Amino acid sequence: MCIRDRDASNVVNRLKAAAFPVPKTLDSFDVAASSIQPKVFDYLSSLEWVRAQHNLAIIGPAGTGKSHTLIGLGTAAIHAGHKVRYFTAADLIETLYRGLADNTVGKIIESLLRVDLIILDELGFAPLDDTGTQLLFRLVAGAYERRSLAIGSHWPFEQWGRFLPEQTTAVSILDRLLHHLSLIHI
């Protein structure tokens, strides 16, 4: 197998492992129709923030392109050689709860921390209970300064108490997310 074929096979495998719900690319995102400044879009597209293990949060109402942007960035990261994993917040918490039930939550988090970029979409779509908030904290704390997190949410940070009921843990999550963060209001 030649190098080009192997590289193409690796991309296909990483795309499958990412578990994107639909295929999206940055090329199919209409920057001119969005509120993302072209200079900011270029920075995000460069993936420098992923290489630097920084985080990204895209905040805005439904239908503004948050998911498209996150999936497009994840797809670009895969083509650049990065490992990516996509979750909706509900799917991530459900996965972590299953791990809690069968005592594998630590292994699940360890496996997630082997990827370069973890995409967490629809955060705040449904409220988390205290245990769900603590499970989310474990992932965010494990990724802190080691992996990039990209988050999509309807809610600005000052309203995250609506879906993260345990205030101390919510503040700890935000502290780690905000430390190295590019924030996009869309």
Protein language model features and the residues they cover:
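Post-Walker A helix-loop "phosphate-sensing" segment adjacent to the P-loop in P-loop NTPases
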Residues: 75-87
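Conserved small/polar residues in nucleotide/adenosyl-binding loops
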Residues: 1-5, 184-186
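N-terminal pre-Walker A segment at the start of P-loop NTPase domains
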Residues: 26-44
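Interdomain "pre-motor" coupling segment immediately N-terminal to P-loop NTPase/helicase cores
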Residues: 4-21
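Walker A/P-loop nucleotide-binding motif
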Residues: 54-67
